[in-house]
Amino acid sequence: MIDYQEELEQYKERIDELAKEKRYAELRDLFLPMEPADIALLLEEGKQEQMPLLYRLLPKETAAEVFVELEPESQEMLINGFSNTELTEVLDELYLDDAVDIVEEMPASVVIRILDKATPEMRKSINEILKYPEDSAGSIMNMEFLSLKKDMTVEDAFKRIRRIGGELETINILYVTDPTRHLLGVLSVRDLLLAEEDDLIEEIMDPDVVWAKTTDDKEDVAQALSKYDFLAMPIVDLEKRLVGIVTVDDAMDVIEEETTEDFEKMAAMLPSDKPYLRTGVFAVSYTHLTLPTT
């Protein structure tokens, strides 16, 4: 991460210099080793008229990760300048929960264009999630997860992971469901690695699953993730069918949002003749989050 304002200014000056001289290959190389959050910061802090050009220099996968880190105003500005092909490429690289977050922040005209260029599967999923109340677990869940059947072998499970795992945001935690999608158990990739290839999933899964409902408060779910040290929390509908997961990243976003609101309320209550909190820096860190195994 970029730690110092001085370093940030040096990067901004270098970017401005290279952009003016149209040394685009060097600009691209400058961004390559950076984290998406740092690139987004540089784009936000730099000259607005340069942002579309600089963004287009990024590799496709990096561009999508940077896009998620940008402020909604910058996202909207870029979308308005995207060709249909460029918009489709960005959407293809986004995880579903990130796409939902973006849609929720955009004006109606931009939302219509996003949904028009999204795949039918993403469009359906976005519309499904947007039906849930804003403060519910359903509104922040990710509908892209990896499920297994209890009569699969460990070898079968690994084949399934290799086949579809690359398209998912997380494959560290796996869920076991019956043919009607009712949640039966949970296990980690570590469990699979330590098992024999011919072991059945039913034999190594943990049937005692901690889950939440789509209607549960999202802050309660975020706190539960922290309490149980989970990487993800399975989310079920009213018929107890598995419909999504809330990851630790989603939980961190919720906790940061709630903390920001709390600080703003505190600041509003302070007398006007005293200093008040103008900016909050939140460091919510989750380390070594693993699912307890039996």
Residue ranges of model-derived segments:
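Conserved small/polar residues in nucleotide/adenosyl-binding loops
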Residues: 287-293
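Hydrophobic packing positions in regular secondary-structure scaffolds
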Residues: 1-270
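Cytosolic-side membrane-insertion boundary helix
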Residues: 264-286
